[in-house]
Swiss-Prot record:
Gene Ontology, cellular component aspect: cytosol
UniProt record similarity statement: Belongs to the UPF0149 family.
Gene3D superfamilies per record: YgfB uncharacterised protein family UPF0149, PF03695 (1.20.120.740)
Pfam families: UPF0149
Superkingdom field: Bacteria
Descriptive protein name: UPF0149 protein PSEEN5316
Organism: Pseudomonas entomophila (strain L48)
Stretches that traverse the bilayer: none
Signal peptide as annotated in the record: none
Length: 184
């Protein structure tokens, strides 16, 4: 039985109760994808991109959750860790549900990246990561409820925790340094 207290379930319930037909995985993928493409961390720009996926302007509760999610992602991408935490169903959810969410995360990432990459030149490694994400977004039904299926899922999930960092490192705009007042 899935953990009803998981962050994924809580966010899914928040989105659903506010009439947004999107999963937390797809929203999180969108946020990571746009951030890795160099969109920066401006809350208004993120909320505008999220509103397109949500199909309506988010209310205050959802808006606050989205801003909090962005702050978490910013800390992960700009921090010292070499992996990100994916917003996916917990391990006690059915493998089919987790695999579907993984595919939705990849679809969101590709959308967010595409909206913000703007024809930037990509290295061969970056192109391979994007091709992998496209492939992963399409194979979610291929995982079977078995030990091999579980191992395959974990392997793909671990890859997705680090692969976007290559794109972020290559494409993301550095934070503009604060201007220092000058004495004249």
């Amino acid at each position: 039985m899935p953990n009803t207290q998981s962050p994924y379930i809580a966010f899914a319930m928040l989105l659903s109760s506010n009439g947004h037909p999107v999963t937390p995985a797809e929203l999180h993928g969108l946020l990571i994808g746009r951030s890795c493409a160099g969109a920066g961390f401006d809350a208004d720009a993120w909320l505008a991109d999220a509103a397109q996926l949500l199909e309506t302007e988010p209310g205050d509760t959802v808006r606050n959750a989205l801003v909090g999610l962005q702050e978490m992602v910013k800390a992960e991408l700009t921090g010292e860790d070499v992996a990100i935490v994916l917003l996916l169903p917990s391990d006690d959810a059915a493998l089919a549900d987790r695999a579907a969410a993984l595919g939705q995360w990849c679809q969101g990432f590709i959308t967010g990246f595409g909206l913000n990459a703007g024809g930037k030149d990509l290295s061969t490694d970056a192109k391979e990561v994007l091709q992998d994400l496209v492939a992963i977004s399409q194979v979610q039904e291929a995982l079977e409820e078995s030990e091999d299926g579980e191992n395959d899922y974990m392997e793909v999930m671990e890859y997705l925790r680090v692969a976007p960092l290559l794109l972020y490192t290559e494409l993301a705009k550095p934070e503009a340094p604060a201007t220092k007042p000058s004495l004249h």
